Amino acid sequence: MRNFKLLVGKEDRIIPELANQLGVKYNSNLGEYSLKIPSELGSGKVQGINFPNGVGLYIIRANFSKQIELELTNDEVKPLRFIYCLEEEFKHKFEEDNDWQTIEQYQHLISAAKQEQVQKLQFSANAKTEICYLEIDRKKFQDYLSFQLSDIEKNIYQLFADVNGIKQICAKGYFSLEISNVINQILSYRGKGFPRTNYLGAKALEILSQMLVIYQNESKPGEDEILKKADVGKIKIASDYIDDNLSSLENIPQISRIAGLNTAKIQEGFKILYNQTVNEYVKQKRLEKAIKLLTEGNRNISEVVLELGLSSRSYFSKIFKEKYGLTPKEFVKNSTT
């Protein structure tokens, strides 16, 4: 096993410090840092960026040849951490805990260590590791807000108010595919320069928002909407099938058969994991694809309607305007002027 002790402070020093302990170089561009895992420890990449609002976005994608343990120690900053598991699993505990807590694929952890308390993350050898990690400097985040923190919901206030690290926080979140989708958008984004910096900042806030929605829902009395991990995988099969077959979708029973779940379970799963019905999800994906097709400019509106699997141009215009505030024709005109 390899152990790395990282001191978390006000500067962007997590990746530089990790690079120093790994004995590798790191890259830096417009505040975004990255390093490659050395071959003696496996393969992969660590990247991260901190923003003026106190939100830091870090992504680890690796296949370690040895078990890896990160020890995160707080300095003058007492951060709040949101850690999402994209692949396989990782383990977490505070230094004085006897047992490790396992965070599975599509789950997340909301945590904060107390003063001088060490938080540990453990990644298995010979397993695909993919996590997205938000590090929130709670003091900076409060200063960035245009309103008083005390005005927000009580349970969320308790997460962000403790800038001195008086209380330990450890909340394991239920499964979410919506967060996974946002992270995958980050991973597939190929923009560079200042547009990339702004894109990453917006996506970091989107991930934070999704995690807070889940945390708020789980904090409600009597909240018991829990899916089995196997069902989460089947819902992912269903959503991937929808994404890849928008032009030929038939109905919900067809999607249910593909996923291997009954229609009631499919609907329940989409509500929990995407906060949408199946039909709402399909409509959203069609509208997202419509923007892409219309922007490319090599299809007319009737061709786009067919490629989206719709039969009515008037219905398409209606839902497009409801979503974007203008008709497809107006969108095309504005895009070409």
Residue ranges, per PLM feature:
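N-terminal low-complexity or simple alpha-helical regulatory segments
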Residues: 1-78
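Alpha-helical bundle regulatory/interaction domains
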Residues: 2-6, 93-95, 100-227, 252, ...
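Conserved hydrophobic/aromatic pocket- or pore-lining residues that grip, position, or stack substrates
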Residues: 200, 242, 266
